[in-house]
Amino acid sequence: MTQPIRESSKQARSSGLCCPVVELRQYTLQPGKRDVLINLFDREFIESQESVGIEVIGQFRDLDHSDRFVWLRGFRDMTSRAKALTDFYGGPVWKAHREAANATMIDSDNVLLLRPALPTSGFSLENMKRPPVGSDDVPKNLVVATIYYFEGPVAVDFIDFFEQEFKPAATSLGARVSAYFVTENSENTFPALPVRGGENVFVWFSIFQDLAAYENYVAALSQSERWRDEVSGQLESYLGRAPEVLKLSPTSRSQLRG
């Protein structure tokens, strides 16, 4: 039986995976301001966060919501998260640009705090090189984040099901599963930035060559007997409500891209 063991920062470094703690952040922005924030973020808020120990994993445009900006960042553990966020938000770069950033936002509190479901299920970023400041070539790749909601903590048997049945089936139909996480239930160590409490989620990320490849995958799901007969019903039996699917287009400087 699969064991959802909490990964230490030492394990993460030795395995080349990122990260033991991950934030999935969805911002609702003022109409027409998404590219304004992305330009500011990609120029000012990547290296400045990484200089204090934050891993900026990826930044995205949500293709289904023109005024939503989604991004991911990671930490070694909850203690270092508190220090890193204190250093960044108390530092000169954020102070210089916070008014411009905040002016683009309606809401920035839609945040899920996550940890890898398994020691091997974090992001592998070793071969993903971030383009330099000033790059404007937007990748064609699509990153899809699927959020499953549960009535209680994600059970070990669901992780077994995902590993042994769901993941092989999805892979065979064209999905490249990148990483998967469950809720990190530790107390928020930086309360100045709220996170969503009381949630029990399993979030998995997949990467596609482009939007057309994802649409082909969705079509293949509906035509697959294996999916209909062996996977879909089991999946629905675990879930507390309908899944949430985020179709995410990486920005020009997103590290997570393809």
Ranges and model annotations:
Residues 64-67, 187:
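Short acidic/glycine-enriched loop/turn segments that link adjacent beta-strands
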